[in-house]
Amino acid sequence: MAKNKGVRIVITLECTECRSASASEKRSPGVSRYTTEKNRRNTTERLEIMKFCPQLNKMTLHKEIK
C-alpha cells in the first residue's frame, strides 16, 4: 500500500508577464508554467518566485496558481 505523502503538495507556477505581454514581445506563443512542490505547513501563502520565462527570454515573476 502507498504511504500518505504528508503536507507536501504539487503546485503550478505561472508567469505573470506572459499574460499581459503582446505577441510582438514574445519569442513564442503561450504562457510559461513550472510545476514544483511546497510544504503547506511552512509556506501557507501562495508562492512568488523569480524564474526564467522562455517565451519572453528573461527572468520574470512566477506566481502559484494551484
Curated annotation (Swiss-Prot):
Extract the InterPro entries matched here: Ribosomal_bL33, Ribosomal_bL33_CS, Ribosomal_bL33_sf, Ribosomal_zn-bd
Can you cite an annotated GO cellular component?
ribosome
The protein's matches in SUPFAM superfamilies, at most eight in alphabetical order, are given as:
Zn-binding ribosomal proteins (SSF57829)
Is Ribonucleoprotein one of the keywords UniProt gives this record? yes
State the signal peptide span: none
Q: Which UniProt keywords apply?
A: Ribonucleoprotein, Ribosomal protein
- GO function term, MF aspect, one: structural constituent of ribosome
Any one GO BP annotation for this protein: translation
- Source organism superkingdom: Bacteria
Q: Which NCBIfam families match?
A: PRK00504.1 (NF001764), PRK00595.1 (NF001860), rpmG_bact (TIGR01023)
Entries under HAMAP family matching the protein: Ribosomal_bL33
The UniProt similarity line reads: Belongs to the bacterial ribosomal protein bL33 family.
Q: What name appears for this protein in its UniProt entry? A: Large ribosomal subunit protein bL33
Record gene name = rpmG
